[in-house]
Each structure stands twice: as C-alpha cells, then as structure tokens.
Design a protein with these regions (language model features):
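Conserved active-site motif detector
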Residues: 1-254
C-alpha cells in the first residue's frame, strides 16, 4: 500500500460531515503529504500542525508525527496482539501505511481518519480489508452475535437511507441468522462504493469475517473482507474533493 487519503470531520461528531482533505504517499524511500481540494471545501478545516501551507508539498524520510502518533508503539506489550487484530503476523514488520490502511488511524471521538482508495487486486477484483464500524453502538444481542461468530462467517449489507447521521450508511448483518440485529456499519469511505457495487446486477459480493478479536477494543473487534468483481468503468476517489490543491493557488489568486 503506497498511498492513503486523510478524511476530516466538519462539525459535531453526531452530525458532522466527513470528506477527504489530504493524501499521504510513500514515494521511493520517503513520505509525501499534500492537501486536496476537500481542504477548501469542508467548512471549518484548518491546516494540520507542522503542515501549515495548503499548497505546499511536504516530504520526510520518516512518517509525519500526525500519522506516526496514530500507530501503536512497538515497545507496547500488546503490540504483537495489535498486529494480529489487523490480520498481520505477530513477528512481521508491516509497512506503517499498511497498518494505517487497516486501522484507519482511528481514535475515540476523533475528527480524523485515514483510508486507502480501493484499487483492483492481482485478480482484477475489488477487495478491501477493514474493521467494522459502529460496534460500540450495537445492541446487547448484536454483541452476543459478534462474540459467537467465527472466521469465515458470511455478512450482508443493507442500505440505511433513513439513518439520521449518514444517508449513505450501509448496515451490516450476519447472513445466516434470521432477524439478526445490526452488527455495525461499513466504513464511510466504502459505503458509496458498496451502493455502486450492489447496483451491478452481475456483481457477486463476497463479504465475510476474517477475524473476531474478543480481546481487542470495540473499534478493532471485527475484521472483515469484502470482495467482488471490479465493475467496468468504475473509478473511485475521482471527485473534485480528492484532487490535489497543489497548482491551484494561482487560479484562486486571479
């Protein structure tokens, strides 16, 4: 994984609007950060500390503190378990962008997340691995379902158009439990894609549990995998808010 987008929330947590404001890349042996047009489109956004110019390119041989601080320190005793929760091997040294791409750099009640832009895998498929969102809001019955689930359990998606916080929300349920309760939600960055994929009549979506981490925090409790054929002409992360701000400052000044 060589690049991630940074999403920021404008407004309060319950009703805030999320959108991309920057892009983090690994280029050869250094890291690069640039702001995207979303940084000018989201009300209230201000530049991150240490990266004050929205039109600058920032490069570093080490991961920028804003993102490095969202990784669990290797010296922590729970670090090997932390790797396993995300599907990595305990003794491996995964790339920090790969870890952030799975954990999304999430912190409780935070206004910042990172996410990868989906790209076709080696088989030309749409394939994403991610932690289920919203588990902390699941009912007691849903929490019990999660505790009883095994790796490989099949999941299904249902649009939740009436969701008061996000009309694009995609709720997640266990496929083989009739009248089962909502377990959580797809990550925001996948919800719009999922609706597009579900609209493809010929597309078969395989959505399964990869790991259940009963010893992990709730936001890392359920690791999922979503896979389906890549639709013809499908190009995620192409809207204006994803485009780089670099090079637009002269046009704004004109």
């Amino acid at each position: 994984m060589n690049s991630l987008y940074i999403a920021w929330r404008s407004g309060e947590s319950a009703v805030g609007r999320w959108g991309p404001v920057g892009k983090l890349e690994r280029v050869n042996h250094f890291f690069r950060f640039t702001y995207t047009k979303g940084a000018r489109m989201l009300p209230g956004f201000t530049a991150f500390a240490g990266m004050n110019d929205l039109y600058e390119v920032y490069e570093s041989e080490t991961l920028f503190p804003l993102f490095a601080n969202r990784l669990l320190a290797e010296r922590r005793t729970e670090y090997p378990a932390f790797l396993e929760w995300g599907g990595f091997k305990r003794q491996s040294q995964p790339d920090p962008l790969a870890i952030l791409g799975i954990t999304e750099g999430r912190r409780f009640m935070d206004a910042l997340e990172v996410f990868p832009c989906p790209a076709p895998d080696a088989n030309g498929d749409y394939a994403c691995t991610f932690f289920l969102h919203g588990v902390r809001h699941a009912s007691a019955n849903a929490q019990h379902e999660i505790a009883e689930m095994q790796s490989g359990a099949t999941l299904i998606l249902r649009p939740e158009t009436e969701n008061p916080h996000d009309a694009m929300a995609m709720a997640v349920f266990q496929a083989d439990i009739q009248d089962g309760e909502r377990l959580g939600f797809l990550p925001r960055f996948l919800a719009r894609d999922a609706r597009t994929l579900m609209s493809e009549k010929s597309a078969k979506i395989d959505f399964t549990v990869k790991r259940i981490n009963l010893d992990a925090p709730l936001q890392q409790r359920v690791l999922c995998v979503l896979n389906c054929p890549w639709p013809a002409g499908f190009n995620p992360c192409q809207s204006e808010e994803y485009q780089p701000l670099l090079g637009t400052e002269s046009a704004l000044a004109a």
